Structure formats: structure tokens, C-alpha cells
């Protein structure tokens, strides 16, 4: 494949940072900000990630229960305040984390009076299984009654109805539950403008993810991105051209803003003329000089200095910067490559 075709993706601006912020101090809800993105890619990536997050991540869920003397969902449960439908709904909300096994047996055995909670569930197989919401109420048991329940917990992805879970291995008398395996509860996103230099025609993707605690939100987003990457690989039907590594490495070590030409900074005419007379072409030339050196420039006063300081601050730059690798040996070729990309 030619370098010309490779520019279809290599010339696009790429995100330089991802910011993570917890919402309401809840570690299970995070907002992630990604910028800058090419115009339109914010919506494309946001929608794709949201769909994968809500459909394709794996988790664990209780898929069936068995209570002695109870044959179906409409049967009464002796000594329990709630009917079986409410009990099933409460059991579906039990959050189970299991990493090393695909399926395990759980046991619930309580003597009343008691408020039966998820923390009373025990693992009969001695597997590495954790109940993440032990205070979650399942039912209320009256005095003088016992409640025994065998539960099966399985791994899966997405949402699976009871009709797809029933199989020949199910114990007689087992009641199957709709299983929501996905650890992601809610996903929302929005796209705003992002600024690169003085240009605002780029996208900023703001995506908020809420999970049940089995996986944290930023890890869930990473898994969704990995799923998309894996699925899209099949469409790449060409060999990529290897870039020149030395130049690529050098470009990565230099702040790309330093390769901008000063005329792109939208300065006053007076400041532009002063920089031109001093042969200051790139932003790198500018920040390599000290304020004292700049004030010695003909027709360059404190007002022009303050103007430049304000502009540089927008890029987190200042006068007198050292150890910035300026000027690079192949300045012209790097600057040309920078222009092609931006």
C-alpha cells in the first residue's frame, strides 16, 4: 500500500488525553472526556462504544433457584411475607462477581424471624465468588419458619431470557430467571467542540458509564474499545507501510505546538513584524528565548510581551523553556510533516 493511502488515517488528528472523573464520589459512575477528535468521530465513537458497553460485556448472574415444595413462579412460599415473583426480582438484583469459574452452586438457608439478605448466601462449591451487595434484601421471613434455597450462578454476556437458559442439566423443580449478565447499568454520551490551537472544529467526546461494581467504568470502556478493535480487524485487507522510525520517534519527543509557525498565532501586526525582524519563525524559536531577550528586540515593548505570554499560556508554554529538544536536527522535515497532519 502506498503512503498516499496511509494518509487516510495517519493524517487524522488523534486524541492526546483521556480524563476520568468520578460522579458524586461514586467509584461505579465515571465521566470520561476524550479529545481532540476529527469532526464527526465523536458521534461515531460515542454511539459505537455505548452499544458495545450495553450489549457485549461479560458478567455473572443467578440463573435459577430451587425451593423445596415450590414448583413454579405462582406457588406460595411458607412464612415469607413477599410472594415468589417479588423474591425472584430481588434475587435478580444480587450482584455476583466470579472470575475463575463459568458456573457455581450457591445456597441460602435461614431460620426466622429474619430479614433475608444477599450476604446470607453461601458458596457450596468453595469457588472464588463474591457477593458485592450483601445488604440487599431478598425477603422477610417470619418466626418459626425456615427458608432453604439452592441457586445457580453462571457467567454470560448481555441479557438472556429464561427461554434460552433452560437446558437438560437443570435440576427438577428449578425456576429459571431472566439473566442480566452485563455489568454496565447505564451509558450516556455527548459531543462538544474541542480546541486545537485557535481552531475549534474538532470533537470532544464526553461519555458517562455506570456499572454494578463488578468492573469499574474506565475498565469497562477499555473492554468495549478492545471488542470494537477486535471485530474491525477483519476489514483491514492490506499491508501497512512502515513509517520511518527515527523521524517518528523524534516527532513524538517534540511538543507539536513548537512546530507551529508564529504567524498562526493571530498576533497583532506590531508583534508579528518584531518576530519577523528577529527571524523567529516557529513557536519553538519563541519559547527558547527569555523575556529579557525579547525586550531587547527593536520596537518590542512590555505590551507585546504580555500579548505573547497570554497566547503561549493557552498552550501551557512560556518564555525561557529549556530541555525541549529545540531546535531538532531535521526541523524542516518535521515541520512539513506537522503541516501535513494538521
Swiss-Prot record:
Q: Where is this region: Alpha C-terminal domain (alpha-CTD)?
A: 254-342
Q: What are the EC numbers?
A: 2.7.7.6
Record's CDD domains?
RNAP_alpha_NTD
A GO term, aspect molecular function = DNA-directed RNA polymerase activity
In terms of SUPFAM superfamilies, this protein maps to:
C-terminal domain of RNA polymerase alpha subunit (SSF47789), Insert subdomain of RNA polymerase alpha subunit (SSF56553), RBP11-like subunits of RNA polymerase (SSF55257)
- Catalytic reaction(s) noted: RNA(n) + a ribonucleoside 5'-triphosphate = RNA(n+1) + diphosphate
Q: Which Pfam families match?
A: RNA_pol_A_bac, RNA_pol_A_CTD, RNA_pol_L
* Gene Ontology BP, a term: DNA-templated transcription
Q: Which is one Gene Ontology cellular component term of this protein?
A: DNA-directed RNA polymerase complex
Does this entry carry the keyword tRNA processing?
Answer: no
Which keywords label this protein? DNA-directed RNA polymerase, Nucleotidyltransferase, Transcription, Transferase
Annotated stretches, region: Alpha N-terminal domain (alpha-NTD): 1-239
Q: Record's family?
A: Belongs to the RNA polymerase alpha chain family.
What subunit structure does UniProt give?
Answer: Homodimer. The RNAP catalytic core consists of 2 alpha, 1 beta, 1 beta' and 1 omega subunit. When a sigma factor is associated with the core the holoenzyme is formed, which can initiate transcription.
Question: Which HAMAP family does the UniProt entry name for this protein?
Answer: RNApol_bact_RpoA
Q: What is known of its domains?
A: The N-terminal domain is essential for RNAP assembly and basal transcription, whereas the C-terminal domain is involved in interaction with transcriptional regulators and with upstream promoter elements.
Functional summary from the UniProt entry: DNA-dependent RNA polymerase catalyzes the transcription of DNA into RNA using the four ribonucleoside triphosphates as substrates.
Instruction: Kindly give the NCBIfam families that the UniProt entry links to this protein.
Output: PRK05182.1-2, PRK05182.2-5, rpoA
Q: What is this protein called?
A: DNA-directed RNA polymerase subunit alpha
Amino acid at each position: 500500500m502506498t503512503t498516499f493511502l496511509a494518509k487516510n488515517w495517519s493524517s487524522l488528528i488523534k486524541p492526546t488525553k483521556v480524563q476520568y472523573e468520578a460522579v458524586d464520589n461514586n467509584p461505579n459512575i465515571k465521566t470520561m472526556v476524550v479529545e481532540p477528535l476529527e469532526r464527526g468521530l465523536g458521534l461515531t465513537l460515542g454511539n459505537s462504544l455505548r452499544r458495545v458497553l450495553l450489549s457485549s460485556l461479560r458478567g455473572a448472574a443467578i440463573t435459577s433457584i430451587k425451593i423445596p415444595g415450590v414448583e413454579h413462579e405462582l406457588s406460595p412460599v411458607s412464612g415469607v411475607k413477599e410472594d415468589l415473583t417479588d423474591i425472584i426480582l430481588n434475587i435478580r438484583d444480587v450482584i455476583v462477581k466470579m472470575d475463575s469459574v463459568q458456573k457455581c452452586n450457591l445456597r441460602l438457608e435461614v431460620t426466622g424471624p429474619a430479614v433475608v439478605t444477599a450476604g446470607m448466601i453461601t458458596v457450596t462449591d468453595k469457588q472464588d465468588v463474591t457477593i458485592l451487595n450483601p445488604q440487599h434484601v431478598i425477603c422477610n421471613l417470619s418466626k418459626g419458619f425456615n427458608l432453604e434455597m439452592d441457586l445457580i450462578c453462571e457467567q454470560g454476556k448481555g441479557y438472556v431470557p429464561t427461554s434460552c437458559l433452560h437446558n437438560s442439566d437443570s435440576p427438577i423443580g428449578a425456576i429459571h430467571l431472566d439473566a442480566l449478565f452485563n455489568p454496565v447499568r447505564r451509558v450516556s454520551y455527548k459531543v462538544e467542540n474541542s480546541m486545537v490551537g485557535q481552531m475549534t472544529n474538532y470533537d470532544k467526546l464526553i461519555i458517562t458509564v455506570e456499572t454494578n461494581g463488578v468492573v469499574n467504568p474506565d475498565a469497562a470502556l477499555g473492554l468495549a474499545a478492545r471488542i470494537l478493535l477486535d471485530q474491525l480487524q477483519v476489514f483491514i485487507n492490506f499491508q501497512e507501510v512502515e513509517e520511518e522510525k527515527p523521524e517518528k520517534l523524534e516527532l513524538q519527543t517534540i511538543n507539536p505546538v513548537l512546530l507551529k509557525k508564529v504567524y498562526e498565532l493571530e498576533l497583532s501586526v506590531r508583534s508579528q513584524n518584531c518576530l519577523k525582524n528577529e527571524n523567529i519563525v516557529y513557536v519553538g524559536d519563541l519559547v527558547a528565548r527569555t523575556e529579557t531577550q525579547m525586550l531587547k528586540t527593536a520596537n518590542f515593548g512590555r505590551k507585546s510581551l504580555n500579548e505573547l505570554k497570554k497566547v503561549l499560556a493557552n498552550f501551557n508554554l512560556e518564555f525561557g523553556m529549556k530541555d525541549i529538544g529545540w531546535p531538532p536536527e531535521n526541523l524542516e522535515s518535521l515541520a512539513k510533516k506537522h503541516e501535513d497532519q494538521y
